[in-house]
From Swiss-Prot:
SMART domains: Cpn10 (SM00883)
GO MF, one annotated term: ATP binding
Descriptive protein name: Co-chaperonin GroES 2
Subcellular location: Cytoplasm
Originating organism: Vibrio parahaemolyticus serotype O3:K6 (strain RIMD 2210633)
Amino acid sequence: MKIRPLNDKLIVERQEVENKSEGGIVLTSQSVKKSNRGKVIAVGLGKRFENGERAAMEVKVGDQIIFNDGYGVKTEKIDGAEYLILSESDVLAIVE
């Protein structure tokens, strides 16, 4: 299935967090916090203004990002894989 985000939305694949502590202890899934880093899979065309123009998107496909994993972030399963749908405003940084 192909998915195309609208407006200023992004499709992101969450990066997994390592399940070992710094001391080498294997952590249970309950004690491992979900990562707020991911890889951008798809990007919308940008937010549309009332005059019909669109804001240019700063985030591009393939970017590694740090995002705010808050209320506006939606989780969807697509072809058995889990993806996040979020707004560009939820992106805190691009990792270079």
